[in-house]
């Protein structure tokens, strides 16, 4: 029976697999009267504090037995998540890491409340799995039998347990008492109710939640428990709570959202896997618009929506930066999510769209003065320097504009662009301009980023078949008013790193003018302010396809560094002007941005780029150690993304759901499940996402929550397609040239002519990669570059960095430190480089002709080159200064440092 998993390990009170129902009920009653004491006696025969190495090793033996049973060829397990033959070895490996970290301190580990509960539950679940094989016998080998379904459920539970263990013991060290809940108000609730506890009995949790979000009945409580208790152990951990509050955000209407989306919605599927979603939707293959949704098992805290397209394909996608109800409403309006589980009546979720109170960021006088000195304002997004900040990343609290966040995520950006912390949620914010008269307000003070004490994992996975319970509850459902407990807590804010990279022209902008510009931006940005969560740009006027020589890139491998190739003089806006005030923040998000420079970095094993594929498989930890360090003193990444490309990706139906080639997990005991790299590439004609039917893990690459619209072959989508193709092959061409010639890293003469030629060479790749412009384009020559090893990526990351930073091929990539872990800035920084003037003689189009237009300019250029500046740097400075030679000299002095001592004389 589908509910057996829960009955024996969850709702039944956690009595052993042979425990009686009355024993479990007594245990639950004791919980109710002893809210802060845990009933370990009914979880395991071990008394509290007896988790020792011997018990762990006994558990390992049970896990090994389960693995051997599951390796039976007759079982023919599918190599897709949740894959028990990966999960148990990974769990074993992480437990070994934990034990090694607590070598000699086993008593401390054994007394850890969370670890005790986890080990007891792991022991119980492995025994339960072994019993399943004994009782199921030959039926275990029938793919659609009930015992086999129960095995899939247990696999999901093991998957949740591993994710939770990695979340509470990252790197093997306990951090449950400092775990960051994503949603601020949810974090405040947990802190007030449970302090620094990592795990609490279900009864204690239910009582505390009931005080804030009233639970109407025992039936509702049971259904709620089956949703929150992902590991089915009668406890709620801070990790599980975080997942639940992310899934059913916003907090103010948490249980109302849960009732509407999980209890009464026919499209909700509890504990379903990627393959099971496909199998279920196969019944409605001739009914386009049929859809169901489930919790992603590989990315806890996010939803996965499966749906049938007009041309009979089954796709699955993950919505980003918006609650599920908003994604379902948007998908219904666009014609994708019409028939939940094939039913003709689609629930109306618009009642959930009450405007959520926006977090107001108050600018302090100190910040106001600091930004005025730099010719900027606090509310201006520091990535694009065009739009106002209107979204806060959770849990780290950094601020930016929606356009930049959307572009970053669609371009495979891993984590927060400022600090690389995992993005587990977003909240709309309003930055209130500094008011000298009303500076005493106690609203949240503004800063570049606010590390909030919260962390959110929107993950609610049905711990097992509670279908009957849900149906019963749905029949007696009562609409609940929004909870008054909805105000976000205050949070301390980090210091703002000063922006010393602004040009003199911006520095001298009067603060009043700056404030006026910001006011107009705020007005233009008011489009978002009334939405529950920021949404990506919608289908609007797409930019025309870029010219072939435009060096913006969509290459996935370049994304974690977030450094686009430099603007050519023809398409780069003059940097001595203030960025244009957009008429619409969304509509103008594709405008070219000023391209800055940053220090180049040497290859590093901890380079965030080298870890890209590591983040694709298991949900925790999501970041490498180097990515987790906030490093406020490190210069931010030196450029903006190509937002014109991002806009096209974001708004076009071509940005389909899970549409990336699978990634090979580089290192883990669990290799089999991630060996789908040989899966054939998508046919060019297929919309993106349709090739994603191999496994759920492609969810990680989902660039947009927008589902594919197969019926729409409008001109805008074709324009987007072209935009994506050209940009992706631009990166590929440059990477190929850079990879094939090691000497290029010191003295390449890669100019626009080479770039155009590179485009021509990569033509055949365009159609192959148009469906998913986010994976690394496979170059025709040499083929081995299409799938590089981590060491290849590490070696190439920084060497490609200089290509994408400033287009100066003479930069010596062996100089420089670690990869900057900061987001791009709108203007260039100093860059240390060794330049050979002779290698830069080939001009680049318009700038070259402009620079040589007058004899005076020519002589000045020769003079500057004799001082050690490269020809390309002089070109750029002249473009920025609009051929004002004095201004160009100032720019060169300020932003270009060279090894030649001649530079000192200038």
UniProtKB/Swiss-Prot annotation:
Keywords in alphabetical order: Calcium, Cell membrane, Cell projection, Cytoplasm, Disease variant, Golgi apparatus, Membrane, Metal-binding, Phosphoprotein, Proto-oncogene, Repeat, Transferase, Ubl conjugation, Ubl conjugation pathway, Zinc, Zinc-finger
Region (Interaction with CD2AP): 648-906
Substitution effect: residue 499 to L: Found in patients with acute myeloid leukemia; uncertain significance
Region described as EF-hand-like: spans on this chain: 176-248
Domain Cbl-PTB: 47-351
Catalytic activity, as annotated: S-ubiquitinyl-[E2 ubiquitin-conjugating enzyme]-L-cysteine + [acceptor protein]-L-lysine = [E2 ubiquitin-conjugating enzyme]-L-cysteine + N(6)-ubiquitinyl-[acceptor protein]-L-lysine
Enzyme class: transferase
Linker: region residues: 352-380
Zinc finger (RING-type) residue numbers: 381-420
GO cellular component: cilium; cytosol; flotillin complex; focal adhesion; Golgi apparatus; growth cone; membrane raft; perinuclear region of cytoplasm
Record annotation: effect of changing residue 390 to Y: In NSLL; dominant-negative; impairs CBL-mediated ubiquitination, internalization and degradation of the EGF receptor/EGFR; decreases the ability to negatively regulate EGFR signaling
Region: SH2-like, residue numbers: 249-351
GO BP, one annotated term: male gonad development
Region: 4H, residue numbers: 47-175
Phenotype upon changing residue 80 to D: Abolishes interaction with ZAP70
Any one Pfam family match given in the protein's UniProt record, by short name: Cbl_N
GO MF entry, a single one: zinc ion binding
Complex and partners: Forms homodimers; IFT20 promotes the formation of stable homodimers. Interacts (phosphorylated at Tyr-731) with PIK3R1. Associates with NCK via its SH3 domain. The phosphorylated C-terminus interacts with CD2AP via its second SH3 domain. Binds to UBE2L3. Interacts with adapters SLA, SLA2 and with the phosphorylated C-terminus of SH2B2. Interacts with EGFR, SYK and ZAP70 via the highly conserved Cbl-N region. Also interacts with SORBS1 and INPPL1/SHIP2. Interacts with phosphorylated LAT2. Interacts with CBLB. Interacts with ALK, AXL, BLK, FGR and FGFR2. (Microbial infection) Interacts with M.tuberculosis LpqN, which influences the balance between intrinsic antibacterial and antiviral defense.
Function in brief: E3 ubiquitin-protein ligase that acts as a negative regulator of many signaling pathways by mediating ubiquitination of cell surface receptors. Accepts ubiquitin from specific E2 ubiquitin-conjugating enzymes, and then transfers it to substrates promoting their degradation by the proteasome. Recognizes activated receptor tyrosine kinases, including KIT, FLT1, FGFR1, FGFR2, PDGFRA, PDGFRB, CSF1R, EPHA8 and KDR and mediates their ubiquitination to terminate signaling. Recognizes membrane-bound HCK, SRC and other kinases of the SRC family and mediates their ubiquitination and degradation.
Name this protein carries in UniProt: E3 ubiquitin-protein ligase CBL
Natural source organism: Homo sapiens (Human)
């Amino acid at each position: 029976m589908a509910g057996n998993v829960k009955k024996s390990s969850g709702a039944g009170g956690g009595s052993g697999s042979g425990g009686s129902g009355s024993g479990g009920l007594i245990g639950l009653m004791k919980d109710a009267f002893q809210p802060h004491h845990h009933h370990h006696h009914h979880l395991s025969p071990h008394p509290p504090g007896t988790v020792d190495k011997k018990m762990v090793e006994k558990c390992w033996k049970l896990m090994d037995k389960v693995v051997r049973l599951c390796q039976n060829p007759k079982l023919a397990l599918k190599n897709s998540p949740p894959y028990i033959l990966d999960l148990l070895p990974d769990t074993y490996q992480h437990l070994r890491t934990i034990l090694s970290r607590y070598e000699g301190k086993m008593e401390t580990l054994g007394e850890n409340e969370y670890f005790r509960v986890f080990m007891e539950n792991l022991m119980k679940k492995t025994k339960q799995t072994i019993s399943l094989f004994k009782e199921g016998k030959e039926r275990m080998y029938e793919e659609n039998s009930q015992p086999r379904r129960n095995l899939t459920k247990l696999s999901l539970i093991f998957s949740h347990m591993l994710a939770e263990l990695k979340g509470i013991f990252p790197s093997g060290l306990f951090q449950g008492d400092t775990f960051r809940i994503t949603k601020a108000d949810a974090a405040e609730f947990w802190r007030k109710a449970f302090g620094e506890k990592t795990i609490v009995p279900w009864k204690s949790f239910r009582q505390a939640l009931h005080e804030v979000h009233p639970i109407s009945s025992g039936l509702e409580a049971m259904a709620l428990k089956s949703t929150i208790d992902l590991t089915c152990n009668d406890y709620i951990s801070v990790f599980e709570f975080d997942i639940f509050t992310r899934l059913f955000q916003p907090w103010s209407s948490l249980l109302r959202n849960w009732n509407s989306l999980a209890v009464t919605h026919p499209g909700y599927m509890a504990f379903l896997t990627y393959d099971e979603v496909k199998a279920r939707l196969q019944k409605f293959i001739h009914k386009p618009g049929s859809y169901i949704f489930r919790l992603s098992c590989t990315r806890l805290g996010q939803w996965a929506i499966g749906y049938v397209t007009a041309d009979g394909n089954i796709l699955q996608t993950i919505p980003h930066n918006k609650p599920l109800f908003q994604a379902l409403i948007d998908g219904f309006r666009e014609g994708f999510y019409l028939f939940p589980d094939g039913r003709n009546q689609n629930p109306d979720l618009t009642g959930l769209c009450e405007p959520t109170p926006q977090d107001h960021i108050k600018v302090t006088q100190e910040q106001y003065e600091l930004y005025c000195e730099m010719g900027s304002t606090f509310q201006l997004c520091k990535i694009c320097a065009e739009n106002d900040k209107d979204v806060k990343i959770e849990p780290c609290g950094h601020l930016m504009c929606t356009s930049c966040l959307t572009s970053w995520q669609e371009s495979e950006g891993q984590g927060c662009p400022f600090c690389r912390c995992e993005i587990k949620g977003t909240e709309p914010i309003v930055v209130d301009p500094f008011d000298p008269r009303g500076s005493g307000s106690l609203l949240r003070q503004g800063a570049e980023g606010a590390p909030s004490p919260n962390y959110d994992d929107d993950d609610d996975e049905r711990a097992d078949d509670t279908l009957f319970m849900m149906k019963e509850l749905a029949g007696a459902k009562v609409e609940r008013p929004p909870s008054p407990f909805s105000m976000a807590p205050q949070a301390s804010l980090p210091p703002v790193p000063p922006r010393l990279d602004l040009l003199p022209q911006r520095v001298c902008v009067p603060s009043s003018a700056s404030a006026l510009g910001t006011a107009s931006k705020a007005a233009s940005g008011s489009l978002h302010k009334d939405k529950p969560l920021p949404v990506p740009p919608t289908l609007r006027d797409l930019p025309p396809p870029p010219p072939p020589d435009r060096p913006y890139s969509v290459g996935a491998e370049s994304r974690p560094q977030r450094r686009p190739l430099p603007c050519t003089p023809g398409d780069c806006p003059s940097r001595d002007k203030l960025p244009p005030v957009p008429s619409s923040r969304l509509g103008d998000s594709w405008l070219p941005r000023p391209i800055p420079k940053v220090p180049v970095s040497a290859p590093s094993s901890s380079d965030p780029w080298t870890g890209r594929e590591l983040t694709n498989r298991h949900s925790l930890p999501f970041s490498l150690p180097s990515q987790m360090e906030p490093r406020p003193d490190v210069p931010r990444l030196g450029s903006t993304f190509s937002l014109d490309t991002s806009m096209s990706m974001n708004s076009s139906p071509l940005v389909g759901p899970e549409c990336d080639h699978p990634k090979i997990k580089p290192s883990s005991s669990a290799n089999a499940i991630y060996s789908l790299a040989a899966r054939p590439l998508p046919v060019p004609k297929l919309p993106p996402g349709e090739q994603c039917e191999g496994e759920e893990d492609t969810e990680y690459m989902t660039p947009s929550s927008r589902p594919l619209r197969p019926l729409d072959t409008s001109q805008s989508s074709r324009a987007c397609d072209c935009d994506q193709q050209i940009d992706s092959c631009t990166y590929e061409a440059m990477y190929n040239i850079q990879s094939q010639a090691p000497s290029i890293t010191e003295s390449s003469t890669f100019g626009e002519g080479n770039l155009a030629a590179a485009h021509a060479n990569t033509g055949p790749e365009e159609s192959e990669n148009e469906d998913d412009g986010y994976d690394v384009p496979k170059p025709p020559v040499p083929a081995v570059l299409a799938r590089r090893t981590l060491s290849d990526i590490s070696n190439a990351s920084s060497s490609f960095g200089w290509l994408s930073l400033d287009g100066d091929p003479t930069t010596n990539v062996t100089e420089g430190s670690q990869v900057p872990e900061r987001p791009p800035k709108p203007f260039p920084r100093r860059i240390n480089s060794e330049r050979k003037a002779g290698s830069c003689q080939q001009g680049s189009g318009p700038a070259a002709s402009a620079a040589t237009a007058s004899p005076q300019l020519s002589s000045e250029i020769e003079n500057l080159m004799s001082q050690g500046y490269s020809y390309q740097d002089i070109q750029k400075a002249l473009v920025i200064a609009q051929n004002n030679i004095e201004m160009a000299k100032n720019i060169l002095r300020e932003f270009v440092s060279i090894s030649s001592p001649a530079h000192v004389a200038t």
